[in-house]
Amino acid sequence: MPCVLGGYSLAGLFSLWAAYQTNAFRAVAACSPSVWFDDWDTYIAAHEPKTSHVYLSLGNKEHKTRNPLLRTGKARILAQAERLTQCGVNTTLEWNSGNHFQDNAARTAKGFLWCAEQLAGQEKPYA
């Protein structure tokens, strides 16, 4: 049975990191991931993902903050999506209404649902 890993915020970033570490996860749901984290952009440029499917999401107001590091979230999620696509990963990026703290359970559920839909009917447990 295919495994899916996912999470919200820092757990979303961990899920993305895991996608670069192992092929044990056929799909990853990185919901509002902390891609603004120091050197994450450098890391993804130097590594290849090992998963087949990645769901990304971000609130459309998350970059509207006084914190200069958090303001980079929108640009970095776009760069993350582009990098995954360049590497041949089936990737979607969904923009949600609101900031980082709105509807996190529903957003995460949508991510796992998307992953399950991508894996429906696939028999091999690893990519």
Predicted regions and their residues:
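A generic "cationic amphipathic patch" detector
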Residues: 18, 41-43, 69, 106, ...
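C-terminal catalytic histidine-bearing segment of alpha/beta-hydrolase fold enzymes
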Residues: 57, 75-127
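Cell-envelope and extracellular/periplasmic
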Residues: 19-20, 32-33, 55-66, 97-98
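Extracytoplasmic/secreted cell-surface and envelope-processing proteins
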Residues: 38-40, 64-66, 103-105
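A short helix->loop->beta-strand "cap" motif at the edges of active sites that frequently abuts
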Residues: 51-52, 89
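Short, flexible/disordered intra-domain loops and linkers
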Residues: 63-75
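Primarily recognizes the serine-hydrolase "nucleophile elbow" in alpha/beta-hydrolase
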Residues: 1-49
